Every structure is written in structure tokens, then in C-alpha cells.
């Protein structure tokens, strides 16, 4: 751990010393400060006080690297304000003026070498640095917010005094400025409104065209559906008529076949009857011939007997 001595006034020590302002010392300790700033070089001294701290490096290059790397960093909820102790920042605030470290250290003698009683030397160093910080900044670490801007008071019409002409002129100027700004803002708003209206009209036209196209598509689809239904009904009717015709033809053909079959049967019956009659006649003729033959035989036998 580095020593607590950070108040040497020789130029080399002052140029290699880093001031750390706006430090939350309720949370951040000396070991934390050394751990953060030791990465930029060897630390030979480190002192932490109420709201600020000092880090003493061996050379100026390490100190400048630490300022460049850690200035503006947020630690424990507060943004650090870091700079070289010999080169304070110029525009740190309006309420106070920052003095150079050389002026602050000029009339203060250097502390003697650290004695075995470290507590006494630490107390002296702490008091010296606190006095340095208090005199260096005559304003609080956190600048209070600016007061609210008061509205311009408009003088009444009854107060017509020559001594208030300058005030009236100022108020008039403020009014004119406000009116000019309001007119500009009104013009800007009017232009914006016109542009918005144009965009809305374009969008409306596009939407209307889309709706019209959708309606056309729906109408075409409905027409196509009706045509398809009509075609289907016509096809069904034609198919049904064809089926009816086919059935009629079949019925007629079947009826003709039946008639022809009946006629054929009748003809067959007639032929059969004719054939039967012929056969009967032949049989009768055969019987007659046989009887005549027998008679002839009988007559021949009688003649022989006589």
C-alpha cells in the first residue's frame, strides 16, 4: 500500500500528482482508489479525503495517462472530476474561481519525512489537503439546478411614466420575440399539418383504389361462379335427356325383339301344324294302300281255291 504523503511542492511531484474530485468517499476507500489508478503506473502516495483524493505517481506521463483514462468515469453513483494538480481545469463552474496548485502550495512548507508516528503526519496531511480543496473551490461539488425562468411581467396600461419606457421597450421586445417564435412555430406546424394531410390523402386514395379493385375481383368471381353453375345445370339437363333417349331406344328395341320373337313362334306353330297334317295324310294313305294290298291278296287266294 502506498504512503499517505501527496503534498510535496517540488515541480516534479506536483506535475505527477492527480487530483480526483467529486469522489464518494463514503463508499470508495483508499484501497479502491489505488486499485483503480495503479494500472497507469507506480503509485508512491495516495490520500483520500472527504469528497476528493490525491494520487502521487513517479512521473508525469503516468499521471497524464490516468487523467485521460479516468476523467468522467462514474464510480459509486458519482462522475469523477480528474485533472493534474498542477494544471487545474479552467471552466469548472460559475460560482467560484479555481486557483492554481502552485499558488496554493507556494506559501506552505513541505512536510518533513514521515516519522514513526504515522497518525500525526496523516492528520496534518488531511488538514492541509482539505484546506487546499476548500480554498481551491469556493462552491459545492454539485452545482444546484438553475432557478426557474420567471415569466415576463406585462406592465398595465395605466402606468404611463416616462421613466418606465426602457422597461416597456424590453417587454415589447420580449413580446415581439415571443410572437415571432410563436409565428415561426405556427408556420412550422402548419407546414407539418399540410404535409400530413397530403400523405393522408394519398393513403386514402390508395386505399380506395384497393377497395375498388377488390370489389371488381369479387364481382368477377361471383359472375364466374354463376356461369359455372349454369354450365353445370345445362350439362346435367343434357345428360339426363340423353339418358332418357337411351332408355327409350332400349325399350323400343326390346319391344321389337319381343314382337319378332312372338311372330317367329306363331310361324313355327303354323309350320308344325302343317307338318302334322301332312304326316297324318301320309299315314292315312299308307293305311289305305295296306288295306288295298290285303284285299288284293284275299281275292288272289280265293281264286286259287276255286
Swiss-Prot record:
A motif (Nuclear localization signal) lies at residues 155-161. The modification Phosphoserine is found at residues 113, 115, 121, 162, 166, 233, 238-239, 241, 253, 260, 299, 306. There is a cross-link at residues 8, 50, 89, 94, 175, 223, 229, 232, 243-244, 250 (Glycyl lysine isopeptide (Lys-Gly) (interchain with G-Cter in SUMO2)). Residues 139-190, 220-306 are annotated as: Disordered. GO terms for molecular function: N6-methyladenosine-containing RNA reader activity; RNA binding. There is a cross-link at residue 250 (Glycyl lysine isopeptide (Lys-Gly) (interchain with G-Cter in SUMO)). There is a cross-link at residue 232 (Glycyl lysine isopeptide (Lys-Gly) (interchain with G-Cter in SUMO1)). The modification N6-acetyllysine is found at residue 175. The modification N-acetylalanine is found at residue 2. The keyword Coiled coil applies. Keywords: Acetylation, Coiled coil, Isopeptide bond, mRNA processing, mRNA splicing, Nucleus, Phosphoprotein, Ribonucleoprotein, RNA-binding, Spliceosome, Ubl conjugation. GO terms for cellular component: spliceosomal complex. Transmembrane segments: none annotated. One of its GO terms (biological process) is mRNA splicing, via spliceosome. Phosphorylated on Ser-260 and Ser-299 in resting cells. Residues 174-185 have a biased composition (Low complexity). Pfam families: RRM_1 (PF00076). Residues 220-232, 242-253, 277-287 have a biased composition (Basic and acidic residues). PROSITE patterns: RRM. Disulfide bonds: none annotated. It is found in: Nucleus. It comes from the Eukaryota. Residues 255-276, 288-306 have a biased composition (Acidic residues). Binds pre-mRNA and nucleates the assembly of 40S hnRNP particles. Interacts with poly-U tracts in the 3'-UTR or 5'-UTR of mRNA and modulates the stability and the level of translation of bound mRNA molecules. Single HNRNPC tetramers bind 230-240 nucleotides. Trimers of HNRNPC tetramers bind 700 nucleotides. May play a role in the early steps of spliceosome assembly and pre-mRNA splicing. Tetramer composed of 3 copies of isoform C1 and 1 copy of isoform C2. Assembly of 3 tetramers with bound pre-mRNA gives rise to a 19S complex that interacts with HNRNPA2B1 tetramers. Component of the 40S hnRNP particle. Identified in the spliceosome C complex. Interacts with IGF2BP1. Interacts with PPIA/CYPA. This is Heterogeneous nuclear ribonucleoprotein C. It comes from Oryctolagus cuniculus (Rabbit).
